[in-house]
Structures are given as structure tokens and as C-alpha cells.
């Protein structure tokens, strides 16, 4: 399978979650070394299996670029998406909402981890991420707010850490109108973290690619290897899918 094959293969009608992995690397283009964004879209289907549904290396990231690529999802079969797990990207977010207006936008703990670790000491970063994870997995909003308030109180003298926490907390709190299971499957699991770290470390291992073609070939090889290892994403999947929110059930019925 080539990168283009992932962008053209037939897809399922409904995905419970689409996890967007964002990476950066460097590519030599006409004797210049340029930063290159990589986006890997991974879908979680109704049977609890992950699959790569698209790999993108935009030369220039614009709304127009993503309008073309996300519209391609519909032509390949995706009629609805229950939840998207991503870091905030204004282009992708806008275009996905245009095509799938009822989708739930969930902040990705894995991407928050990677976006923030360079700005906080290792010790504090472990604590902040552990406690944000507890907020995300809390059974009720009230329980989540207790964990959040304790965390903010612990770091009340550190303005940077408080700003980082508050940048994401409202998006996490908004998810509490959905079931506990709907929140937990949005990319917080150890399986997703290992998957993300495996892909990230292999990309960083190269550092500089001599061309976009070389980058695409390398991505093709490492993603084929990674995808071959994937098993059902969540244990007791049948029980979880039965306890998901009623609006997921409505989406399924609409497609039957």
C-alpha cells in the first residue's frame, strides 16, 4: 500500500472516533530545508478496530487544501463521524464542521502532552498530565472540577502552568454532557499513546528527508508496519458500544 492508497481506499459509513496525529519533520526542497507538517488520520470503527484513513503532507496548509481532502472522505464512504480527537487546528476544525456539523470535537490528551512538554519541567509535566488525565476520566463533572481546582491550587504561583491548564480545560469540561465511555475512548488509552510514540520516534529518527517523495515512502513503510500490529482498541468493546450515548445510536440507525 502507498500513501495515495490510504487517501483513496473505500471507508466505512460511520466512525466512532477519528484520531488525528500531527507530526513535524524537515524536508530539503530546492536546496532549502523546510519544516514539513504530517497529518495521520486514524479511524476507530464500530467493531473497535483502528485503521489509517488518510495520510497528508500539505505543501501549504490552507482552508482550501482541507476542503478538498475532507470532502474526499464523503466520496470514499464516510457519512458520519461521532467524535474527532485532535489538537486545535483552525483549518481542519473548520472544514470538518462544514462536512460533519454534529461531530464532537474532543481534545487529545496525547497531543496536549506532546505540545506542552518542552515548556514545563519533567517533574511538573508528569503531575499536570496525570491530573488532567484524572479530570478527563472522572465519572462526573463535579468530580472533574474538584481535581482541576486542586491542581490549579497546587500551581497557583506558576502562571505558565496555570495558563497551559486553562487553555484546554473548558474543552475537556464540555465533554461531560456525553457518557464516560464516550470520553475515555477518545485517544486517552495507553494503546493510543504507544501507537503515537512509536510513529513519532520513527519520524524523528530520520530528522531530515531529501525530498517529499522520500518522506512519503518512509511514512508508507513505518505505517504499514504499525498498522499490522493493531488489535481491538478497547477491551470489552461490545459492552462499551452498548453504553455509548443515545445520539451515537441514532447515527447508527440513520445509516441502516
Which role does the model predict for each range below?
Residues 95-191, 195, 201-209, 226-227:
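Extended amphipathic alpha-helical interaction segments
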Amino acid at each position: 500500500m502507498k500513501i495515495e492508497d490510504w487517501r483513496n481506499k473505500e471507508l466505512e459509513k460511520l466512525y466512532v472516533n477519528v484520531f488525528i496525529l500531527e507530526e513535524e519533520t524537515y524536508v530539503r526542497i530546492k536546496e532549502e530545508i523546510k519544516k514539513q507538517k504530517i497529518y495521520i488520520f486514524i479511524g476507530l470503527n464500530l467493531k473497535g478496530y483502528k485503521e489509517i484513513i488518510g495520510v497528508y503532507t500539505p505543501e501549504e496548509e490552507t482552508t482550501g487544501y482541507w476542503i478538498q481532502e475532507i470532502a474526499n472522505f464523503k466520496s470514499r464512504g464516510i457519512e458520519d463521524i461521532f467524535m474527532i480527537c485532535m489538537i486545535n487546528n483552525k483549518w481542519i476544525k473548520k472544514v470538518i464542521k462544514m462536512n460533519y456539523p454534529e461531530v464532537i470535537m474532543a481534545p487529545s490528551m496525547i497531543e496536549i502532552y506532546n505540545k506542552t512538554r518542552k515548556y514545563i519541567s519533567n517533574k511538573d509535566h508528569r503531575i499536570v498530565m496525570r491530573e488532567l488525565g484524572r479530570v478527563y476520566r472522572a465519572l462526573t463533572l463535579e468530580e472533574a472540577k474538584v481535581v482541576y481546582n486542586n491542581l490549579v491550587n497546587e500551581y497557583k504561583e506558576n502562571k505558565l502552568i496555570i495558563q497551559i491548564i486553562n487553555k484546554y480545560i473548558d474543552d475537556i469540561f464540555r465533554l461531560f454532557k456525553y457518557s464516560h465511555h464516550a470520553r475515555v475512548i477518545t485517544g486517552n488509552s495507553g494503546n493510543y499513546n504507544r501507537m503515537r510514540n512509536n510513529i513519532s520516534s520513527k519520524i524523528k529518527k530520520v530528522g531530515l528527508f531529501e525530498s517529499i517523495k522520500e518522506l512519503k515512502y518512509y511514512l508508507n513503510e513505518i505505517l504499514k508496519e504499525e498498522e499490522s500490529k493493531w488489535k481491538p482498541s478497547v477491551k470489552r468493546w461490545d459492552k462499551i458500544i452498548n453504553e455509548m450515548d443515545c445520539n451515537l445510536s441514532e447515527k447508527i440507525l440513520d445509516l441502516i
